[in-house]
Amino acid sequence: MEALAKSLGVNIKTDSPIKKILVNQLDEAYGIRANGENHYCDYVLSGADYHHTETLLDEDFRQYSEAYWEAKTFAPSSLLFYVGFNKKLKNVNHHTLFFDVDFGLHAQDIYDNAKWPEDPLFYASFPSITDESSAPNGKEAGIFLIPLAPGLEDTPELRETYFNKIMTRFETLTSQKVCDDILFKESYCVNDFIKDYNSYKGNAYGMANTLLQTAFLRPKLKSKKVKKLFFTGQL
């Protein structure tokens, strides 16, 4: 994508977090401010989180209040673990969903009563099973994912607790010991989605696709208050 964009004349600037969307007296977006420098343009097209994009505008130019966003239903966040194992694992596939506990209870903890699930369902991916280049010879690369409600407390202690929960079950369900063969482990959760993507409450997928958040009931792609401002992100 980068090569294609550059071939079409796109100038990509990295390490340039946007601090403000510039709006003129005609209520037109005419640029952005990043790293203390203004960059001018004919249109502003934001692929960032919609709520975050609006915080880059002066309050009078924002279409939706904090109460509006608070009332919306968002897709789950996730707790992810990226794990390297010092051996090839048995009884696993490239993609596996572990539904060995009550799906309904986990769903309630995401959508009805937001909290950390007592017994979470989880997903595991081992790309090195089908792409040998994704792990060294004789090793295994694994990704584990637990769906979570957005906006939950996120601490290193909670992450470790849930890693131990799912790994205990994983060992039982696949009839093997793996925890003593972990070479590398990195986690990613609510706070990281907020820090890296400015994602509202750390959600992973944007607004949920509920009946009352479908089609014209979703936030508009074109700003009603600022001309030449369009949204594509987290919708």
Predicted regions and their residues:
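C-terminal segments that line or cap access tunnels to active or ligand-binding sites in enzymes
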Residues: 86-191
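Mid-domain catalytic core of redox enzymes
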Residues: 19-135
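Generic, well-ordered alpha-helical scaffold segments in large soluble proteins
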Residues: 4-8, 47, 56, 165, ...
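A glycine-rich dinucleotide-binding beta-alpha-beta segment and adjacent secondary-structure elements
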Residues: 123, 176-235
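Short acidic (Asp/Glu) and glycine-rich catalytic loops that position anionic groups and cofactors
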Residues: 60-62, 142-148, 228-230
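Hydrophobic, well-ordered secondary-structure elements that form the walls
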Residues: 45, 83, 144, 170, ...
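A conserved beta-strand/loop element that lines the FAD pocket in flavoprotein oxidoreductases
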Residues: 5-18
